[in-house]
Amino acid sequence: MKLVVGLGNPGPEYARTRHNVGFLVADRLALALRAEFTLRKFASELAEGRAGGERVWIMKPQTYMNHSGESVGSALHFWKLGLEDLVVVHDDLELEPFRVQLKVGGGHGGHNGLKSVNAHVGGPDYARVRVGVGRPPPRMDPADYVLGRFAKADEAPLEECLVRATEAARLAIELGAAKAMNQVNRRASAAG
């Protein structure tokens, strides 16, 4: 069994913000796996599907970003899953906009959702689908930037990025993070 977590904030005021790309990818992964968010457990919305012969739970924590780890930690404990069974999808200020990268472990880079997940699951050694949102303009607070919506001109590249991020999460489930990283990150490098 695998757990894929899309990080984001609940509520319509946060829909389609940079900080909610994890939720957007979770929605697309659920659609691809013919799963629906019908279960409410662990202070989250859950959808159950199958990929690569594996049972997959897709989670959207409803705790707000800074407390996402509470939901993730509870689910891992309940299902007796290890960090190798976890894939987290999140926005990343350090990656250029619309770039997708798969990695295992590493620092939280100031991302409060990742800080919370790390604290509640016992460390950072899980697969992450990083979705680049770029840096804020000079003198703009990064918190305001990530809570801002994408511009209309960004809709086409955003949709393409979400397709690639969804595929990265699916490959991490089906192939394991190490093999999936070779494919995902090679494609990302070739794309520029």
Swiss-Prot record:
- A family per Pfam: Pept_tRNA_hydro
User: Keyword set for this entry?
Assistant: Cytoplasm, Hydrolase, RNA-binding, tRNA-binding
Q: What species is given as this protein's source?
A: Anaeromyxobacter sp. (strain Fw109-5)
Q: Where is the active site?
A: 19
Role this protein plays: Hydrolyzes ribosome-free peptidyl-tRNAs (with 1 or more amino acids incorporated), which drop off the ribosome during protein synthesis, or as a result of ribosome stalling. Catalyzes the release of premature peptidyl moieties from peptidyl-tRNA molecules trapped in stalled 50S ribosomal subunits, and thus maintains levels of free tRNAs and 50S ribosomes.
Question: Which CDD domains does this one have?
Answer: PTH
Compartments in which it is found = Cytoplasm
What this protein catalyses is: an N-acyl-L-alpha-aminoacyl-tRNA + H2O = an N-acyl-L-amino acid + a tRNA + H(+)
**Where mainly located?**
cytoplasm
Organism phylogeny: Bacteria, Pseudomonadati, Myxococcota, Myxococcia, Myxococcales
Top-rank taxon of the source lineage equals: Bacteria
Question: Where is the site labelled Stabilizes the basic form of H active site to accept a proton?
Answer: 91
Q: What class of enzyme is it?
A: hydrolase
Q: What is the name of this protein?
A: Peptidyl-tRNA hydrolase
Tell me which Gene Ontology terms the entry assigns under biological process: protein quality control for misfolded or incompletely synthesized proteins; rescue of stalled ribosome
